[in-house]
Design a protein with these regions (language model features):
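Vicinal oxygen chelate
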Residues: 2-12, 34-82, 92-120, 131-132
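Active-site-adjacent beta-strand anchor residues
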Residues: 17, 81-84
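Short, conserved charged micro-motifs
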Residues: 23, 87-92
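Conserved active-site tyrosine of GNAT-family acetyltransferases
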Residues: 24-29, 95, 124
């Protein structure tokens, strides 16, 4: 097996590009319980336990020329924002309390043995929570 000698730790830090960073941040805080680590209208870093979980970036911000096309209506076609949850039952209660749109679930995925809930996230993205 080929292994890169310079790679010590790899942590995903997905960036979601949205029109309204502040509204998307509020959704992730309200529904997933994440914490604002930056705040602002152009960029947000959302954390859990001090670790970055997801980044939000505004379409029109200039410093990243390869974010995509804001005029393309597809949001994450083929890409899902997937989060592991320690307390899946608590998450489902919270989803109900926040009136989050549930697309599917809760269901048991026979391949992973995990329960899943697929919900509508900000600006049309699909967010999946999975847990025991």
């Amino acid at each position: 097996m080929l292994r890169c000698s310079f790679v010590r730790v790899v942590r995903p830090q997905p960036m979601v590009v949205v029109a309204d960073v502040e509204a998307a941040s509020r959704w992730f805080q309200r529904v997933l319980g994440l914490v604002s680590g930056h705040g602002g209208s152009e960029y947000e870093s959302l954390t859990d336990g001090g670790e970055m979980v997801v980044q939000l970036h505004r379409w029109e911000a200039d410093e990243h020329p390869h974010l995509g096309d804001p005029n393309e209506p597809s949001r994450g076609n083929g890409v899902l924002l997937w989060f592991a949850m320690d307390d899946f039952d608590g998450f489902m209660r919270h989803v109900e309390e926040t009136e989050t749109v549930v697309l599917d679930g809760p269901l048991l995925n026979p391949n992973s043995g995990q329960r899943e809930a697929w919900v509508r996230g900000p600006e049309g993205y699909v967010v999946v929570a999975a847990g025991p």
